From Swiss-Prot:
Keywords: Amidation, Neuropeptide, Secreted. It comes from Sarcophaga bullata (Grey flesh fly). Belongs to the FARP (FMRFamide related peptide) family. One of its GO terms (cellular component) is extracellular region. The modification Phenylalanine amide is found at residue 10. Its main location: secreted. This is FMRFamide-5. It is found in: Secreted. It comes from the Eukaryota.
Length: 10
């Protein structure tokens, strides 16, 4: 999972 996608999880 890319950093941006990981951020979008929240």
């Amino acid at each position: 999972l890319s950093p941006t996608q990981d951020f979008m999880r929240f």
